[in-house]
Amino acid sequence: MGKYFDVSYMIQAFPQLLNYVHVTVLITVISAILGVMLGSIIAIIRLKKVPVLNQLFIVFISFMRGTPFLVQLFLIYFGVPEIMSHMGLNMRNVPGLVFVYAVFTLHIAAYSAEIMRSSIDAVAPGEKEAAKSLGMTEFQSYVRIILPQAFTMSIPPLTNLVIGMLKGT
């Protein structure tokens, strides 16, 4: 097994890898924050069944959850600049890291949308009725009562999602 796995090379390369840990952490943190925010908005739109947006987000979520991450990365990195060039926009000089942030954010948004949708559905209907009986608007009831409980319930699956994303970077 000596010619397939060289421990001395691994020990030599490890300090070089440590120089880039901050990039991995930065990609993970920024994409997780933006992805969960976008996913929460998508979840609310899906729950409210906004006519056109609901169908678009169903397709978006199915695509993002059903295709391998590497395929998504290739499609965004090579496809978006090509499409934009036909529209007269030159995206050839955009740094590759921008596309990495975009793909990770969209990927996390798709998964977190389903997590948040199920978490919001899990909040007891009586909580929503109580907020309405107190005279709260729908926005107030979401911000003050429903979303805090939903976020509490979604912490374990969101943590798993972020850990998986960290490993994926």
Language-model segments: which ranges?
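Transmembrane alpha-helices and adjacent helix-loop boundaries
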Residues: 1-169
